[in-house]
């Protein structure tokens, strides 16, 4: 079904990145050019990877922003990054990452810079996109609640080494390493239940 990426040429990697494999960064706002409007950047991104007109790319960008439940996608496309909230910029980044229905999405702390309410919305939207497009997601997070909610499989790392791995239920309910046990014990309790 798959093939090794280890022997890919630079050109093969270029064709994969942004289309079949995509990335959401911790601060998507930092990856956006501050002196270019969102629409200009989004249209360029789409046109770089496809043979569509700028008008078609604009429509596709608006459609993806609407899927991320951003109000008034046309207005967002006409905005500069600094005119959007952190949550809105993060949604723009996720929309861009999902534009080509990637097979694999890498998400590096995609919610850590956001308030709790926005975090929950972003996580739900990522899972909806996963379900809609059949995208596999590898998420790097320090948030045990996000990991417990999103993951089918968990890998716990300490100092760059794997110390626990398995299904979500195996790792959450039967951790094997002391490190994982300490992480889980540090999760706050509410009415006698761990808050994950």
Residue ranges of model-derived segments:
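A short, proline-enriched helix->beta-strand linker immediately N-terminal to the Walker B motif
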Residues: 99-103
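Helical segment within the ABC ATPase nucleotide-binding domain
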Residues: 120-133, 145
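ABC ATPase "signature
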Residues: 165-166
């Amino acid at each position: 079904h798959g093939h090794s990426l280890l022997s890919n040429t630079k050109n093969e990697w270029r064709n994969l990145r942004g289309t079949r494999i995509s990335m959401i960064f911790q601060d998507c706002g930092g990856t956006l050019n501050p002196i270019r409007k969102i629409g200009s950047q989004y249209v360029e991104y789409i046109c770089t990877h496809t043979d569509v007109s700028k008008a078609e790319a604009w429509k596709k960008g608006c459609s993806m922003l609407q899927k991320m439940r951003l109000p008034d996608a046309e207005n967002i496309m006409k905005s500069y990054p600094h005119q959007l909230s952190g949550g809105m910029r993060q949604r723009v980044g996720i929309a861009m990452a999902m534009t080509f229905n990637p097979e694999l999405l890498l998400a590096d702390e995609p919610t850590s810079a956001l308030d709790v309410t926005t975090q929950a919305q972003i996580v739900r939207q990522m899972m909806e996109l996963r379900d809609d497009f059949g995208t596999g997601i590898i998420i790097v997070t320090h948030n045990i609640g996000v990991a417990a909610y999103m993951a089918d499989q968990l890998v716990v790392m300490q100092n760059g080494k794997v110390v626990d791995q398995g299904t979500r239920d195996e790792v959450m309910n039967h951790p094997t390493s002391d490190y994982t046990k300490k992480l889980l014990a540090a999760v706050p309790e509410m009415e006698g239940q761990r808050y994950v």
